[in-house]
């Protein structure tokens, strides 16, 4: 899980989710997991 100020989709399988005001990226490639913080 990368924690970044700016989260962007890395590949076309990445999906942007917003849970409780936290922006997350989930992807089938585990290296692409990110959250904003």
UniProtKB/Swiss-Prot annotation:
SUPFAM superfamilies: Ribosomal protein L36 (SSF57840). GO terms for cellular component: cytoplasm; ribonucleoprotein complex; ribosome. GO terms for biological process: translation. Transmembrane segments: none annotated. GO terms for molecular function: structural constituent of ribosome. InterPro entries: Ribosomal_bL36 (IPR000473), Ribosomal_bL36_sp (IPR035977). Keywords: Ribonucleoprotein, Ribosomal protein. It comes from the Bacteria. Belongs to the bacterial ribosomal protein bL36 family. HAMAP family: Ribosomal_bL36. This is Large ribosomal subunit protein bL36.
């Amino acid at each position: 899980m990368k924690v970044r100020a700016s989260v962007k989709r890395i590949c076309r399988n990445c999906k942007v989710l917003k849970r409780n005001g936290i922006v997350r990226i989930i992807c089938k490639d585990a290296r692409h997991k990110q959250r904003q913080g």
